[in-house]
Amino acid sequence: MTTLTLNTSLLSSRRILAAFSGGLDSTVLLHQLVLWRERHPDVTLRAIHIHHGLSPHADSWVRHCETVCERWQVPLVVERVTLADNGLGIEAHAREARYRAFAQTLLPGEVLATAQHLDDQCETFLLALKRGSGPAGLSAMGERSPFAGTLLLRPLLRETRKTLEQWAVRHGLCWIEDESNQDDAYDRNFLRLRALPLLQQRWPHFPAAVARSATLCAAQERLLDELLASDLTDCITTEGTLRLSPLMSMSDVRRAAILRRWLAMRNAPMPSRDALERIWQEVALARDDASPCLRFGDHEIRRYQSQLWWIKSVAGQHETTVAWPAWQTPLALPAGLGTVQLVPGGELRRPREEESVSIRFKAPGVLHIVGRNGGRKLKKIWQEQGIPPWRRDTTPLLFYGETLIAAAGVFVTREGAAEDKEGVSLVWHA
């Protein structure tokens, strides 16, 4: 193996963060990048090691990585992550935590390099095949992918695991062996330890053939992206919701492709074919007076005003009251709703000395709001302002004593209007 692949993949990258577990693959990657840096003195190279805490050897792995990086004069960042059961399985959760740490560590202008190789590509393809994935899932991994506002590079993706081993032995590299890699209870380990050796014994070039199929699937997806671009433009609103009216006249296949691409744009997990059918039948086609909802993990799909919405699930706060005695400072809201703050300059009057300040999420009675004649109940105001039902009991309402002053970002009541230039604004950082 030469550095030719690295030359191609990293041609324009001069600031590199390498994912470094200390195993064979990432050790070869880091060694290759060190050689690349020697040939290109303007390259800045760092490494990051993720301490998952899953193995009793995790601390010794950190020390090993520190030793290697010190020898190669590569600054090392060690990030410790805490894993909890999120229903996705330990493999998926560890990966999610790992990439979140990568994103948080990247510096401006820096790209992330990871050590996936041809055998990994084959395993990823077969796992997607086992799940019944379509062309998007079977596209597997690309050598370059958008990530955290920059790029994720996989410079070794064309190389086999055997080639990496030969390189490591030839150059006297030392690496660690994660004992969990020998546990074939994990699907990926089962493929690597049992299934792929058997397939390669019969068909030696099986991983390369699978990689070609993945590349063809990716090309088909790019073509579909181009062909459906105008449809997406017609369907997606400036708020990122999906208009239903254009979808009604589409074929099932075309509509499903639009739904998948919309969900991908919202960073949602790719739904199965059955899930797409449920989205259409149970949410999009629900009766007009319904408020349909379909949960996907900690998010949900809703319909409102003939549009589909992808939103984070938040428990209603209808009965919640949050006192705000120090109203001059920001107030943290419950249920991850963010913070509110009263800032100088605005159309709200300041609270009087005898008035207590609080945030609530319901308001009884008839309300009179600035800019509208007559009184109306809060439900009617929400409807007139186009506030979706799920936001109505999570939108902060500012009270002085028992008087409603304002709804964050929606309206000000007559009782809350400032009479001078010393007013304030209610700012909600959701």
From Swiss-Prot:
CDD domains: TilS_N (cd01992)
Subcellular location: Cytoplasm
Pfam families referenced in this protein's UniProt entry, alphabetically: ATP_bind_3, TilS, TilS_C
Cellular component GO terms, alphabetical: cytoplasm
Any one Gene Ontology molecular-function term assigned to this protein's record: ATP binding
Single biological process term from Gene Ontology: tRNA modification
InterPro entries (alphabetical): Lysidine-tRNA-synth_C (IPR012796), Rossmann-like_a/b/a_fold (IPR014729), TilS/TtcA_N (IPR011063), tRNA_Ile_lys_synt (IPR012094), tRNA_Ile_lys_synt_N (IPR012795), tRNA_Ile_lys_synt_subst-bd (IPR015262)
Disulfide bond sites: none
Binding-site positions, ATP: S21, G22, G23, L24, D25, S26
Function, in words: Ligates lysine onto the cytidine present at position 34 of the AUA codon-specific tRNA(Ile) that contains the anticodon CAU, in an ATP-dependent manner. Cytidine is converted to lysidine, thus changing the amino acid specificity of the tRNA from methionine to isoleucine.
Name recorded for this polypeptide: tRNA(Ile)-lysidine synthase
Originating species: Salmonella choleraesuis (strain SC-B67)
